[in-house]
């Protein structure tokens, strides 16, 4: 991540106060980014988004239109955020009452969150997890989990390529060739 990258695109109708924007990042119309936010390389921040100060966005992240990312949200590399995803940062909000600290929400590497989902403060979306559209996430979602609903519940597991995994004797082989194991409620990729 460079400081005030010369190779990023900022639409003339965007307000970008931060100098911490990576190379080849595109920021479209009516986006407002506050001064302390950090945005990595090759990101795409679509129209009508707001990004607060205590926000980190990694490399190769897609932020679709209508998303507000509040203080305390940390987004790792290769994450997809569908249109109008909602992040909260205060579990017990009141007007003009400010918490000493905001809940920390982490979206891990390769995760995808479907359109109009709500991510309640303080939760972790695991690596390559997939949250279905319109879901309300009220607890952590583990790596590779496919979760959806209100509240979001684990309905299965997906490969990095997004294909649904079918476990037999706690092992799965995806059509793309990647192998996984399931043990003690945790899915992990087998490197062979």
From Swiss-Prot:
It comes from Aneurinibacillus thermoaerophilus. PANTHER family: ACETYLTRANSFERASE, ACYL-[ACYL-CARRIER-PROTEIN]--UDP-N-ACETYLGLUCOSAMINE O-ACYLTRANSFERASE. It comes from the Bacteria. Its EC number is 2.3.1.197. Catalyzes the transfer of an acetyl group to dTDP-D-Fucp3N to form dTDP-D-Fucp3NAc in the biosynthesis of dTDP-3-acetamido-3,6-dideoxy-alpha-D-galactose, a glycan chain of the S-layer. This is dTDP-3-amino-3,6-dideoxy-alpha-D-galactopyranose 3-N-acetyltransferase. SUPFAM superfamilies: Trimeric LpxA-like enzymes. One of its GO terms (molecular function) is transferase activity. It is an enzyme of class 2 (transferase).
């Amino acid at each position: 991540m460079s400081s005030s990258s010369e190779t990023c695109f900022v639409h003339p109708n965007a307000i970008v106060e931060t100098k911490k924007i990576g190379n080849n990042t595109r920021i479209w119309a009516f986006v407002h980014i506050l001064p302390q936010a950090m945005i990595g390389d090759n990101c795409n921040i679509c129209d009508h988004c707001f990004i607060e100060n205590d926000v980190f966005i990694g490399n190769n992240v897609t932020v679709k239109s209508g998303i507000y990312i509040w203080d305390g949200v940390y987004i790792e590399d290769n994450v997809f955020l569908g249109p109008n995803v909602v992040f909260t940062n205060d579990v017990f909000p009141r007007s003009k009452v400010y918490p000493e600290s905001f809940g920390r929400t982490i979206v891990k590497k390769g995760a995808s969150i479907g359109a109009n989902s709500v991510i309640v403060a303080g939760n972790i979306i695991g690596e390559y997890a997939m949250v279905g559209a319109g879901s309300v996430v009220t607890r952590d979602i583990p790596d590779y989990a496919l979760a959806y609903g209100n509240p979001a519940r684990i309905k299965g597991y997906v490969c990095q390529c997004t294909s649904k995994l079918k476990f037999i004797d706690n092992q799965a082989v995806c059509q793309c060739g990647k192998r996984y194991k399931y043990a003690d409620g945790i899915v992990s990729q087998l490197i062979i």
